[in-house]
Amino acid sequence: MIHIKKLKNMKNKEFIIKAIMSGLLIGLCADINNRIGGLCGAFLFSIGLLTICMLELSLFTGKVGSSNDAKELFTTFVLNIFGVIIMRILFTFNNMFVLGIGCGMLMQIGVTAYKKNLPILTIMCVMAFILAGYKHCIAYAYNSLDVMSFALIVLGNIIGAKICYYGGVKL
């Protein structure tokens, strides 16, 4: 009996992570779209949905048409909104650290997409981080040697990549 309960708890934890991660991705891509705008911003917004589909994450608007489980749909909705709110709050602080997080997330998505034989998604991630003004520590080193900014970008890149990795953006 304990093993079944443990398995159920593991599935619940996985469900929660997948739903929050979906919200984080939609929030990230909403920020990209807000920064870039127009056709290009709209096109790059699809990074979120492509990643959610690639990794079988849990997005309310991707489930609502095919699921009749009201409790699961409601929970997914709430957790998606929670993820979006986290990103909205984060991106109100438009500094090197936060811009590094955005880039770190996109680089983790891009590398994972490449390993899953989706190179167009990899290219889209590079386009998004450049056009949105997110900061890549290695590219930044070419342009500036401001040590404090560089350190914040490195830390942001690490945290952004780890958020995605532990949220399921991996092989």
PLM regions: where:
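Alpha-helical transmembrane segments and their helix-helix packing motifs
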Residues: 1-171
